[in-house]
C-alpha cells in the first residue's frame, strides 16, 4: 500500500504548535483594508488557535498523514 499523502491545502493554511494545538491565520486581512479600521486590521494580522476539538482532529489527520 502506498504512503498516505498530507493534504497540501491544509498544510499551507494550518500549522501545528509544539503543544499539539492547530494555529491558523484570520480571514479578511489581505486586501481591501482601506475601509476597515486600524484596530480591526491589527487584530486580523494576528494568528489564532482552533477552538473546536473535532475540527482540530480532522486537520491534524490531514497535515500529519
Swiss-Prot record:
The keyword Lyase does not apply. HAMAP family: Ribosomal_bL35. This is Large ribosomal subunit protein bL35. InterPro entries: Ribosomal_bL35, Ribosomal_bL35-like, Ribosomal_bL35_CS, Ribosomal_bL35_sf. The keyword Ribosomal protein applies. NCBIfam families: rpmI_bact. The gene is rpmI. PANTHER family: 54S RIBOSOMAL PROTEIN BL35M (PTHR33343), LARGE RIBOSOMAL SUBUNIT PROTEIN BL35M (PTHR33343:SF1). Pfam families: Ribosomal_L35p.
Amino acid at each position: 500500500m502506498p504512503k498516505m499523502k498530507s493534504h497540501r491545502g491544509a498544510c499551507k493554511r494550518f500549522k501545528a504548535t509544539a503543544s499539539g494545538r492547530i494555529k491558523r491565520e484570520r480571514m479578511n486581512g489581505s486586501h481591501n483594508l482601506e475601509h476597515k479600521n486600524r484596530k480591526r486590521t491589527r487584530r486580523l494580522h494576528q494568528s489564532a488557535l482552533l477552538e473546536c476539538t473535532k475540527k482540530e482532529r480532522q486537520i491534524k489527520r490531514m497535515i500529519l498523514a
